[in-house]
């Protein structure tokens, strides 16, 4: 399976509050339109495996660019003083330019993506909460290095028989230290995939290689140094891709303190 697609990513757009149960667990309001934010591409980290070793980084560096094959294998870094939450999501990989799309049908999603991937939208929850209370942007809470763990791509040919109902065939799972925490079908999304693509395109042009995270189901929880994370993407209950990460203390001087 390939990670080369990551080299073409110019932006990562994340849909928030797209599962009712997740909205309820965080006591948030339900948006009438798809609500989104951005993550930097420097937050990308890819899984370790028997054939991949940690990327060699300069001392105290937590990102040194993607490798030639698109990988950036390493751990999830937990910054000091930060309460990090996992949010498992289906990722869409955009395959063509989309701008000012007035209407999109469900079956048109297939031709607009090159495939899907499994991703974690990691969130510095206490950093985000403080920013919200002060009415400040909360980009940093989503954008730390390694806060975008992502799998190899699953090519769209894998699900070519389901062009009209992609919304209904996927399921995402996240386990921490062997305990299942998140498990949700994409059929539970409040805003469907075609609406997400169409809506974003009216404000921000989508380009080939862009990554769109489509929201997380209920069950978000904290990650701590030493934790082992296992995530799965299923198609009609069959595993099509998974990923594993270990959590470590983040090197460097950063430490979050409430002000």
Swiss-Prot record:
Q: E.C. number, please?
A: 5.3.2.2
What domain of life does the UniProt record list for this protein's source?
Eukaryota
InterPro entries from the xrefs?
A: Fumarylacetoacetase-like_C, Fumarylacetoacetase_C_sf
- Cofactor binding description: Requires a divalent metal cation for activity.
Task: Provide the cofactor list for this protein.
Answer: Mg(2+); Mn(2+)
Gene Ontology biological-process annotations: oxaloacetate metabolic process
Pfam family membership, one: FAA_hydrolase
Q: Which GO terms describe its molecular function?
A: acetylpyruvate hydrolase activity; metal ion binding; oxaloacetate tautomerase activity
The EC category is isomerase
Location comes to: Mitochondrion
Q: What induces it?
A: In high salinity conditions.
Task: Specify which residues bind Mg(2+) according to the UniProt entry for this protein.
Answer: 87, 89, 121
Q: What is its main location?
A: mitochondrion
Q: Which GO terms describe its cellular component?
A: mitochondrion
The protein's annotated catalytic reaction(s) are:
oxaloacetate = enol-oxaloacetate
Keyword Disulfide bond listed: no
Q: Which terms are listed as keywords in the entry?
A: Isomerase, Magnesium, Metal-binding, Mitochondrion, Stress response
What family is reported? Belongs to the FAH family.
Q: What else is known?
A: Present with 2550 molecules/cell in log phase SD medium.
What does this chain do? Tautomerase that converts enol-oxaloacetate, a strong inhibitor of succinate dehydrogenase, to the physiological keto form of oxaloacetate.
The family database entries (PANTHER family) matched by this protein are listed as:
ACYLPYRUVASE, ACYLPYRUVASE FAHD1, MITOCHONDRIAL
**What is this protein's name?**
Oxaloacetate tautomerase FMP41, mitochondrial
Source organism per UniProt: Saccharomyces cerevisiae (strain ATCC 204508 / S288c) (Baker's yeast)
Q: Which gene encodes it?
A: FMP41
